[in-house]
A protein has these predicted regions:
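A secondary-structure boundary/capping signal
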Residues: 84-86, 140
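N-terminal beta1-alpha1 cap of cysteine-dependent amidohydrolase-like domains
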Residues: 1-84, 91-98, 104-110, 117, ...
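Amide-donor transfer/coupling interface in amidating biosynthetic enzymes
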Residues: 72-76, 101-227
Length: 227
């Protein structure tokens, strides 16, 4: 499996993602935002960070980078694209995913471990019959997912919600919502389910000595179901 991680000015999770992908068998290449062509890829990842310093809006300037045209063509051809945190923000700013990501409910930067419940387990990102609650890490100031009434109806009708913020038992409620996100949404797909955006960082949970192992389960499922 070949993957590409896009580096923007201000990305700070690109190397973490590179380590995670290689650990689980991907042949990964780092791609600079000013490049115009993607290398051979089965998966393209837009990593976390603060692209362009989060000026204007988070992800807005990065969504206009030269590489985004190739990513758009790749996605329209059915290629798998994943955006984590700032990468999720870039995907909504580019129109590849619905909705927007607003300031957190209490206007504070949040950095902590949380639990998420996987939805739509028939897709290649969360296809695991033994597990549907994951412990991941979040670190963001703008993770409050929001969209119009028409959009949220369409998202629910098409089963596009990938992850809900939950407690450790998988209960989705106000108490388990860290940022005010609509319907506790932590991640969404496009209609075709080949593009995923999520605020939590699975790449930070791949070493039990440092954090946890739920990210390992995520990446193992990912590569197994891309084969």
């Amino acid at each position: 499996m070949h993957s590409s991680v896009i580096t923007f000015p201000g990305s700070n999770c690109d190397r973490d993602m590179d380590v995670a992908l290689k650990k689980f068998g991907f042949k990964n290449k780092m791609v600079w935002h000013d490049d115009v062509e993607l290398p051979k890829s089965d998966l393209v990842v837009l990593p976390g960070g603060f692209s362009y310093g989060d000026y204007l809006r988070c992800g807005s300037m990065a969504s206009k980078s030269k590489i985004m045209k190739s990513i758009l063509n790749f996605a329209q051809g059915g290629g798998k694209v994943m955006g984590i945190c700032n990468g999720f923000q870039i995907l909504v700013e580019s129109g590849l995913l619905p909705g927007v990501l607003l300031r957190n409910k209490y206007l504070e930067f949040i950095c902590k471990n949380i639990f998420v419940k996987a939805n739509n387990k028939g897709n290649s990102y969360f296809k695991d019959d033994k597990k549907d609650v994951y412990e991941f890490h979040i670190a963001h100031n703008e993770g409050n997912y929001f969209c119009s009434k028409e959009q949220i109806k369409e998202i629910n009708d098409n089963n596009q919600i990938a992850l809900f913020y939950s407690d450790e038992n998988g209960n989705v409620n106000e108490q388990s919502n860290p940022n005010g996100s609509l319907q506790n949404i932590a991640g969404v797909f496009n209609k075709q389910k080949n593009i995923l955006g999520m605020m939590p960082h699975p790449e930070r949970m791949i070493d039990p000595a440092l954090s946890g192992e739920d990210g390992s389960i995520f990446f193992e499922n990912l590569i197994n179901n891309l084969k």
